[in-house]
Curated annotation (Swiss-Prot):
Binding annotation for Ca(2+): 434-435, 437, 453-454, 457
Gene, per the UniProt record: Nell1
Keywords: Calcium, Cytoplasm, Differentiation, Disulfide bond, EGF-like domain, Glycoprotein, Metal-binding, Nucleus, Repeat, Secreted, Signal
Compartment(s): Cytoplasm; Nucleus envelope; Secreted
Pfam family for this entry, one: EGF_3
Protein name: Protein kinase C-binding protein NELL1
UniProt keyword annotation of Calcium present: yes
Gene Ontology biological process terms in this record: cell differentiation; negative regulation of osteoblast proliferation; negative regulation of protein catabolic process; positive regulation of apoptotic process; positive regulation of bone mineralization; positive regulation of ossification; positive regulation of osteoblast differentiation; regulation of gene expression
Residue ranges constituting the VWFC domain according to the UniProt record: 271-332, 632-687, 692-750
Amino acid sequence: MPMDVILVLWFCVCTARTVLGFGMDPDLQLDIISELDLVNTTLGVTQVAGLHNASKAFLFQDVQREIHSAPHVSEKLIQLFRNKSEFTFLATVQQKPSTSGVILSIRELEHSYFELESSGPREEIRYHYIHGGKPRTEALPYRMADGQWHKVALSVSASHLLLHIDCNRIYERVIDPPETNLPPGSNLWLGQRNQKHGFFKGIIQDGKIIFMPNGFITQCPNLNRTCPTCSDFLSLVQGIMDLQELLAKMTAKLNYAETRLGQLENCHCEKTCQVSGLLYRDQDSWVDGDNCRNCTCKSGAVECRRMSCPPLNCSPDSLPVHISGQCCKVCRPKCIYGGKVLAEGQRILTKTCRECRGGVLVKITEACPPLNCSAKDHILPENQCCRVCPGHNFCAEAPKCGENSECKNWNTKATCECKNGYISVQGNSAYCEDIDECAAKMHYCHANTVCVNLPGLYRCDCVPGYIRVDDFSCTEHDDCGSGQHNCDKNAICTNTVQGHSCTCQPGYVGNGTICKAFCEEGCRYGGTCVAPNKCVCPSGFTGSHCEKDIDECAEGFVECHNHSRCVNLPGWYHCECRSGFHDDGTYSLSGESCIDIDECALRTHTCWNDSACINLAGGFDCLCPSGPSCSGDCPHEGGLKHNGQVWILREDRCSVCSCKDGKIFCRRTACDCQNPNVDLFCCPECDTRVTSQCLDQSGQKLYRSGDNWTHSCQQCRCLEGEADCWPLACPSLGCEYTAMFEGECCPRCVSDPCLADNIAYDIRKTCLDSFGVSRLSGAVWTMAGSPCTTCKCKNGRVCCSVDLECIENN
């Protein structure tokens, strides 16, 4: 789609939004405190005075609380979030200084789909969400746990994140679009993460979720609201993608239609029937007089049905007889001679030959053919005047029998008899129809067979799972022994009456057709269960269920450059530049890209007065000639610290700095747990109270105050009975495409854009599908002619993958 069309659409959105304004639709918001029905008697909270009197405020302080939504509220929340790319969480909070806690969490079991957390110890606000089935965290440095009132508004618009604090825009970031289709069973928690973790300590007021663009306007009406949001733009892009998908489908249909037309041009569409040299068009009907059938031409095939004859009620002086050229008997007058009754056409030999015609015996002067047998062997056939020799072919003279009957010679006459499997129509054996032996139960099919009717006969077919013994009997088929089954190699095949059944072997799970190995404790960090309770671990992990990270640094598997130090990460490691060094932008895995920082050239040194800065590898030195100017004092925050002076940083009460010979050195405060006045905030390891211990996320392990541990790509620390967790620091990557592999916590560089997790939603990076239709970056479609192949436009390249389960099911 041309860029000018997109700009026109963009202008239309801007204009429409400016004109319509921002009226609040009550169906597009959720008042959390009202929906949770909090009252002063709710366990764990106390109603208190808030920042204003327009709404209720509640103090959250007791850890023995479970403030979560009722099932009907959870269902309402799921419906509100469904397919929404734009929402804002608002609240007015007053958090106890230096504490950590979750203000709001929307989660299902262990998955946080929306969670806002404030950490006092690290002075940051964290937004936890899910993208592509994986947890994501955005850490936003800000000190909100200060005992003061704050208005907080976190807005998400597709891949755009906005954080307003006290109506000031604090952060604006591009993030991976969060998953908003909440699974059944999702729950909303206020003031805590779940039953045991993330307890917020402080007051919460005005908790709301707004499902409309620029929802922060509800809290701060004077903020700018005229610009379209990221979601607006992505909606336009999605509209273009939908049009492209429609164009692709129409192109496919057009190509198919053109192919069909090309085929039709080379053939005659109408299917005709040719019978006895005559051509009949489709749906033409005619009478097959020879066989007394009504026939129709249907799509090139002849379908015939036996003509039905009406019942005859002949008078006493007439008899039903066949007339040549007619299919049904008719009533004709009978003749009587010497007590013998003759029907129309029958003859009798008296002195002369006479034939019954119209009820009168008429003299026949027809000459008889000469015979080649002796007179004593002559035979007079019934109702005839001419004698014949033995073995005479009466069938050659008799009326023609139908297709399902056959002529049979007797000594004195010929008759039509129905073939085996047929029965006469209305008592006339010249015309016969099929006997359905199956329906009439006239078959001899035994058990484990199915009777199948055929023209003139029937067949006994074996039911599935059985093999034929003779024409009427079947015996059970050994599917398992013969290998004619679809059981998985790790399944047990059992013969059954219907055929066979498949059951997974002990230690495997599945439907028998597909059996997967089962590991009771699971395989963590992307490990694969290859046999019962046997995991194959990905690189960087070990243990019976891949629960142990391999410390490549401690094990000596890695040798970092001397300008860097090895930092272990779950499943991986990286070489981090030492203090006084920085990366040159090539980000070498071994740390070779760490180069010295020239503090002197950058004027980041602390040399004072007449002293000269001398750059050193990983640091600097101050050289001062002897004299009164060489005091060794240090400049600090616009002031001066004397040589030998020690002080505590105002922004970090847990760090102490000293000035020595013009250089400033800072370190963490040493902890003396024997000192009764020790600062437990800076020295949590000195807090021996039982109430200050922390339960880990699994609820299985207890940590002491001050302990550190790693969980799900987060670094956690126990402080005053509450675990504070933050994302592990990952090395910077200077490559275009990155991917996070299963079980790892940090992305790696990849050269193939199809392997990359990150997608550049750039309308200039398009792809051409198999029909030549242009697709925007991020578009997904099914490959033509291959329903199990899905393609995606990633960074200007078509990336296709095959769904193996789809192939198995189709």
